[in-house]
């Protein structure tokens, strides 16, 4: 670990371990123009050395100036989050976004204005289609602390048992005692089979309902008795492959924070790749020249959104 810090739970011991995914990505160009890249440095915060730049796509979403949810940068203009985070109001003027935030509360960065809210048209409760995007009034400028995350293509799925990371500022619960972290952090989790997840949540089934966890969801569990809690809504579930981070999920819901027998549930981003693409339809999508030895199958790895000549690796 960097910065000489100690990790008693061993959660951060292997942040660069690649995820096992069904296809491989390809990307060229410098990291500053790429997605899913990090530039980790050390900084003294409140007298303690902490890592900064580890999760540069992470943003905080505010309602009337108060933090309510997390989100992730997928483009100069666009933020990905959970639909249930935006139920307080459909008026974009009431929401703002902060990028490059390392600790909460934060008074060092400016609030960015939101001009448009797009909630999935099928979202009617917190259980399914829990995805939304926000459009910023002005494009953000990339820096070592502000970078976009990659999105998966439709057929990109993490294998069962893959270790991924949940990123956010929300509540964490260990050994029955909740605590509030103020620095953005990652929690190591493993992908759980949806059928097992369904079995754990079968008591929630309604009459004539055959399953609760749909194809638009992913489930994870933690081996350390830690888990995501209510204040992590909208946070990113990211997996790393070939040193590139890909957002595979958006924190949606769970049953009672920290209960290991109940997996955390996420919106599967790969399920909504085409939906996101349709919402950002005013952009021009172009392809990238690639080495001849790469097959088209390899190009189905992830999406990189760039404002000029937007690139979708599909």
Swiss-Prot record:
Keyword vocabulary terms for this entry: Disulfide bond, Hydrolase, Membrane, Protease, Serine protease, Transmembrane, Transmembrane helix
Enzyme kind, highest EC tier: hydrolase
UniProt subcellular location: Membrane
Disulfides per UniProt: 69-85, 164-239, 197-219, 229-257
Residue ranges constituting the Peptidase S1 domain according to the UniProt record: 44-281
Pfam families: Trypsin
Entry-linked InterPro entries: Peptidase_S1_PA, Peptidase_S1_PA_chymotrypsin, Peptidase_S1A, Ser/Thr_Proteases_Immune/Dev, Trypsin_dom, TRYPSIN_HIS
GO BP term, pick one: proteolysis
Active site residues per record: 84 (charge relay system), 130 (charge relay system), 233 (charge relay system)
Taxonomy, superkingdom: Eukaryota
GO molecular function, one term: serine-type endopeptidase activity
Segments passing through the bilayer: 293-313
EC number from the UniProt entry: 3.4.21.-
Annotated Gene Ontology cellular component terms: membrane
Keyword Transmembrane: yes
This protein's record includes keyword Disulfide bond: yes
Cited PROSITE patterns: TRYPSIN_DOM, TRYPSIN_HIS
CDD domains assigned: Tryp_SPc
Membrane topology (UniProt): Single-pass membrane protein
Family: Belongs to the peptidase S1 family.
Name of this protein: Serine protease 46
